[in-house]
């Protein structure tokens, strides 16, 4: 007999009764607000085709590196979890994979995955017992059965989750066919894209040659020549904007920027295109391209997102056997003050530009990022990110950033996820942690309750809409209520 | 109708009733103790001339980079706030500037400025409504009217604020005329100076040539020759000591120290004086001068303060248009263990020397500073500084420093401010946060209440007096009570 | 009349009543569990000879650098505390030294030493008044008298402290005679060793030449030839395993690892042995030897412990007068992601290897260590260490590590101490802080109480036994209950 899954309505609120009471009141103001998800990695084909998801392992376990990295760290093989390797998807029985997961679920105690998964299990699927070995089959069967119903198809879940806007991420070398299909389908869900050009900027990425080929096709430009390479970016940015994009997204190893002359930049590009790639030149080119992207933003208005500091695919053995993105990305020490100076010297006071900074190095919150964002008009701070998208991580972000940057140089929450079913859970955690933080401010008389009430709504809804320029829906997008009424 | 300004008597105390009760009791022991302000940047001419302050904008807004940097970060122009540029003070109507400030006051939610300003508004000026757009004019008028009265002249406020000692900061190239005037005025307020020689030590500072010229005048020495350059320092240090100084103050980019031979040091100086300035040589000279200053302290007893780690005037556009110190100083990663070793190897065990270290890089609290101060007899730790002079920042300082360095290797609070009216507010915050920290220690049975009671008085009053050698007033300085009786 | 020493049963528990109640309940489950001490620095001769300890100063003060570093930082001379210098033990009256300590005991307020010492005073010696100048003699006399009794001999205390396993640390060049004596004595206390080869790996350590000589003797190998140097390690590791060792221990300046070819490694070793020592070559050799040790672990199963980041003996004057290990070790910024990559690329996925990482740089908890341990099967995280072995330090460890690495990639508590009497105090603090952390999780509904109950037992007892492979006692070791029955 498994333990009852009591997913408490006061979860994540401080235990002190006065503070908890304020937290409850603040959370009540925002718990039913629509979800703004301006930065994430869901698959647009889900919403284009609206095909049902397959089974519990295929949807929840095998693609989620948060989950399989933890199990891998404890000696569980990725094959046993049905995680795709370079040889393809292992032929592990998905039910067996789910059993392995269930019997190791205790590993997630104290992690945000515990909160997210139990939210999904209880709120999305209606389970009332904690997952464990004894009920693994019941979980697997009931989830798989639910997924076969219309109520669990992607669009139905999108509506049920009360998502107002959902951004995916694509590269300039990728087609936007699924976004076109969504737009033309008449469904009306506001699914947009974001412009992530890393693969055609990073000459050290082994995927770069193929991405350049496809970039030439999608843009119709000679992308091996500097001026038309830039023109290709301009054209694709516009195509992304036509597909709803309001932001670009840049995941570089460091925050380095540069401000080369046109002649220098062209010479650097030519050298790299010819295959003369050194780490220094690749880094300088990435740095220069952040400034080039910023210059394009002056004209087309895309908000820039910069999130540096991950050592990608650190586990060489796993990269060789399983390829990229298998939970082996490790944060590195990151520097912003010198790194951003060339770009900021060029454009830091330009009212047409908006840059959202992220970090995996929490030491920069109070030392670098809050002082920068609390001064430069072009800078804002993205929420605590990736490993730090967690109750303690979010609280540290607020505690270390707010006193210098205030709340209004931050941009609300990003779920940044490809785990579609966890989106409501992640936003719920953010709303609860922000409520808890503000509740403490009120309980300690550092803020008036009226101010906290305004702030919780701003942090949840108004700031992300404003920061990501999502204030207006395009004609083809309609609120879920209208979609529901139309059905 | 604006919201009532309820500035609660329990502000900044933890909400848990037991802890709050201890905090109240501890705070009650120190809330009326005199203010010791051993490190700050108020203008000594205020106390020398005792001329009235001008208006709300001129006193509270335009000179305060904490305030205008936040508004600037949100797109408000400095001209609209009447902040001086290189072209002079903008002719903005001060009332209009105040209105802009009032309508953006919500930006300061969650920041220490919110606490400080509401303290000033309610406790110094008696306002009972929160500042907002609707009452901006009322605020402006009442503040400006109050400032015209004798009760709001600098000396009257000094007495009302119960300041026992206030240190300003001057350079060796600057006159101490205002301090002389204060001393000779018969007023009796204990306003002293501190010796800050950065401008005649940092050959990379563009103000350095003019400072050297004036240093030659104030010292009567050939400051372009190494031996008389050092003699000029010795003479000016003594003049500062005669004007009450008990400390020197060193704001270098890094904490680097050096221990060159006399021959090496002289050669380095000669090279720099001849204009052969490279970043490496300028850095080495700053490093060597910290050791030279320490050697002079052995003889004259000045306490050294070292606070490295700020990238000054990071915003190049703003530096060009508005000059230095416009809220664009950004902290950098800072290293102490290797940097201080030359000086500590030379003098680290000398009982005649006392060095107070500050940081803008909070990661050094537990890793470097507390271990250093918990071992070396010459080292003590200054309070959380600048961006970290805030409730969360102060609490992090105590939490991260105390377990290794204890309380008695710290030196109490520094307000470090040029915002004279905020001095009581800042000291009040420090007293409250220390009370809250000690209250938690007591509530968690990690300290006896008797010990906490001794400590709160030590942290507030005894430690700063001892660390800054302020145990004795000079003959010309008299307590406020005597000054009041004399009037 | 000194204050009563009220060492409260709720110490270190949060004040919030609901949280405290959970903390009490969790702590009750583990407070009487046996102590597993898999990493420490007690002297095995104590347990081999079972000779009585001498007096309060000799046992508690003079050898404890946590204590005398704090007093030294406040100007107390080491001679006054009877701390051994290069000239020998000062002839200070031990009672006088104890009086100096007592009159400065207030310096330890807020530090873990305060908690540990008051635990020892009240729980081990039965004092009921806080130590202060007025009762210094009473403390000295009563402690010294107690130490002369059989109940305070090392083995009796070992039993009374309910220690199940205690590991000491020896070098490969050192004899294991005391461990042999313990094993053969019939006493049955499970005192084991750990393999710490730093002195024969670090060519920059001035003790290295003498250590190599002794290494040749203990191993019977030509340790100046690469292949037999490695063989000497293999032989000594096996001898340590025979003396109960389950782990090796590596205290390097950095976490650097290398993976040289055999030819490169041999050439490097030959060059160093010939005396051609540069910092770069010494560092590379240390780096390579971590990989060599890991390779040997594949065969012999020793768990590797790596704890980098201390600048040893920073105070040059004190090193000259008093020698090493006098409280002047200062942590440095430490990097793991690049540093460990060579070793992890070679062996990071090998199920035969287990590495426990420690740090003195808390910034690496959430940025580097938790992400590494939350992915690599060979990595686990040691507890907060040295300066961070403290209530706040332990809490930061849990708060910053758990969300990414979970609990099961950590290994429970290490006391890491040579202060034998403080071992129960230190483990008690860890149990209380873990109880407090878990209590908050439960009170905030982030974990089920049943899970927290399982976890507190795992963190206290099961994880260290498993991580250090202490699941089985050897034949010669018997539980304290059996030893007691036998007497």
Swiss-Prot record, chains A, B, C:
SUPFAM superfamilies: Metallo-dependent hydrolases. It catalyses: D-glucuronate = D-fructuronate; aldehydo-D-galacturonate = keto-D-tagaturonate. One of its GO terms (molecular function) is glucuronate isomerase activity. InterPro entries: Metal_Hydrolase, Uronate_isomerase. Pathway: Carbohydrate metabolism; pentose and glucuronate interconversion. It holds the Pfam family UxaC. Its EC number is 5.3.1.12. GO terms for biological process: D-galacturonate catabolic process; D-glucuronate catabolic process. Keywords: Isomerase. Belongs to the metallo-dependent hydrolases superfamily. Uronate isomerase family. HAMAP family: UxaC. NCBIfam families: PRK02925.1. This is Uronate isomerase. It comes from Caulobacter vibrioides (strain ATCC 19089 / CIP 103742 / CB 15) (Caulobacter crescentus). The gene is uxaC.
